[in-house]
Amino acid sequence: NSRPLTANPSLPMASREVLVLYYSRHGATRALAQAIAQGIDAVPGAAARLRTVPPVAPLVEQAAPPVPPEGAPYAELRDLEECIGLALGSPTRFGNVAAPLKHFLDSTSGLWLAGALAGKPASVFTSTSSMHGGQESTLLTMMLPLMHHGMLIVGLPYTEAELATTRSGGTPYGASHVAHVSAGGLSEEELRLARALGRRLATISLRLAG
């Protein structure tokens, strides 16, 4: 049986949240997540739900107390079920997604079997310490499990003027941050593009949710 393209039209407006799910070790990816959340919250009828994942121990078990000492709560599978859209973020690890986020994504096979995420829009974002540190390969890698889930990829179009002029982060595949370019945090271009991605994702999520 074919599934409908819309995310979940039965959701009440009050529960139409876009999940911003990320892993951040030094805070750069978290800052990007917060900027995307600001863009989501700027769209009437949408709200951002910020969630993170715990680090992994050498034995590849997630190792952390049930509640993080600061910042966003740890994600649960129900966060993915309940959202109408997803922004997924990770710092680059040798051109790939960081292990803690990959570990969490590997636990979503039950959602995949149920088709729980099929038809929901999703965006990706990343941060690196250098300009050519693997941003685009990391963004593309993060898209793969989302496509297996049947999610609809939402990127950044070149109608966003900063995308053509940025000297730091920002790609058509998703928002990004180059840490060494702006040591004080996100550059103005990175900030604008992250917020633009949040607005675009939220707008499309609401349209698909009906």
Can you say where each PLM-predicted feature lies in the sequence?
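Short, glycine-/small-residue-rich phosphate/pyrophosphate-handling segment
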Residues: 118-168
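Compositionally biased, intrinsically disordered low-complexity regions enriched in proline and serine
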Residues: 2, 23-24, 159, 174
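N-terminal beta1-alpha1-beta2 submodule of the flavodoxin-like/Rossmannoid cofactor-binding fold
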Residues: 11-116, 170, 177-210
